[in-house]
Amino acid sequence: MLFPVCLLSVPSVRAQTKEPASTSAEELHGGIEIGAKGIKSVAVRIVGDERGYSVNILNADILNTTIVQTKNGKFTPEAIRDTGSVTQRFYQRLRQDYRIPPEQIHIVGSSGLIGDNSQDLAEEVRKRTGQEMTFLDVETEAQLRIAGSIPRRYRIGATWYDNRGVAVLIDIGSGDTKGGYQLLRRVAGGAPEYDYITWGIPKGTVTFTNEISKAAGETADYQTFAKRAQALSPESVRAILRNEVARKPGLINRKRIYLSGGIVWTMMTLIRPEDRSTFTPVTADDITNFYNRAITNPEALLNPDLSRIRNKALRQEAEREVESVRNTFTPKNLIAGAEILRAVAGEMRLAGKQIYYARYGYLAWILSYVRLQAEK
């Protein structure tokens, strides 16, 4: 079982600085996450003190790749080569710009990587970096995401309350959908501990897009694609979600919901671009609104009117993020992801609950992983 960790909120991944030469090399750590839709790289400084550990993010980079592309169940040679090249570039930057020792850089593959030839990808990474690549299973990745995405406490007035005992994480990725919660366990003669209850289904925004395209045809128009998504969802998405809920009642009994993942980021960027808070409130109506717009006119949804944002700096930041969305997801990805999001909202009964978008949840598990390695 993984030990709970508490990560600091990321103020801005654009605030990137090189670490001064006086920093001890033992404090510098790096992580490279290879996921279904892209690669993330983080450089962090981890310092131990009497309260535990503090984490300072020095740099965070993200670049989309084609690794999710498969042929006959295998990653294509082009996808492997592309991913290896980006990984090498990120690795060299961690070594040269941030002077992180090679033994303190960890290259990790997401559970959303679905291909029968993962060893070919690992060999490409090893050839380009000299580093071994670790692959996570769904349960371990979900544990890391929970620890990194859900704040340990919340406050009402002047009183603090335990948050992880009443909250659940839902992460809709490109390759799968997963999450979970922590369950308090009393220990005789000692302090209470948390167990992780995790869940996951092999359906994500891109994998479901591929499934719909196979059924509807690669050249299907958006209306046909949306109808096929609606037809596939009951058995392909909702049925397996319902099975997870039946086995893990905490998924519907908890009242505080934290959402993360690419399609959630896309939704919040497109329907509420001016809100930059770390934990942004979301409603079930927001999800319904996003879904209806995605299935009726996804291209219009990808081009929101940002002129209403009066603050120039905020508007420019929103413009950059909207452009990132357009570079990451196609209109058909929007339709598929919105269908999964609607299924999650229905099967997990999100209406009436306190829902939050964890803005920096996309960095959660790689930061948690790096920190756990540093604590060994």
Question: Where are these predicted regions, by residue range?
Answer:
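Conserved phosphate-binding loops in N-terminal lobes of ATP-dependent enzymes
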Residues: 25-132
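Boundary at the C-terminal end of the N-terminal hydrophobic targeting segment
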Residues: 13-17
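Helical "lid/coupling" subdomains associated with nucleotide-phosphate turnover
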Residues: 70-98, 115-117, 121-165, 188-191, ...
